[in-house]
Amino acid sequence: MRIAASAASFGILLAGCRADTVPPEQLQRQGREVVALFEQSCAANGGDSTKVTVWAESRQAQKLVADEVNKLPPGMMESGVQAVWRIQKDGADYYLGLSPDSCSVKTAKADENTVRQQFEELVKRGAQGANVELRADNAAQSPFPIRQLSYAWRPAGSGSETVLTANTSTSDRLPVQAALMLTHQVYHSAPILEQD
């Protein structure tokens, strides 16, 4: 399943031990900002690549060339990413990525509790009449602490859903402490039954 794969890829790659420390207040600001950017870019535009691109250009985000993307820490971007923008705010870098089936916003440092709280508020606020369904609330401690919170927006009776996922960590040994992702998938409420 895509959700489990995103959590696994988030936790597998390391950038080495990071010695830089960020004050708690700044981590909270960065937690609020990463969710706000995700809401404005990915969620508000349904992950549509054309709309997300227009949004990034309107914000004068710096579009990265392939060489710059390749120099990002492992795990900062998904394999197969087609476009990446860097947004800098208050000394922090946020990366907006578009892949064929997803839209993501990530940052190296953010307060985990702030990200999760803001993410849950976004999920409820942004549903616009769709059903909000919890898909995952997982935690792992080994090899590093990682938490995953995933919800789906699904209009009543729809055969597809929009899945919003927040992968977070408190570990300074991971290159990304907050990774927010939007994907679309077919909704499977029950096994398909064959009739004879």
Identify the function of each model-found stretch:
Residues A36, Q40-K89:
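N-terminal secretory signal peptides
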Residues L14-G16:
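C-terminal motif of bacterial Sec signal peptides marking the signal peptidase cleavage site
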Residues V22-K51, Y95-Q117:
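Terminal, regulation- and interaction-focused segments at domain boundaries
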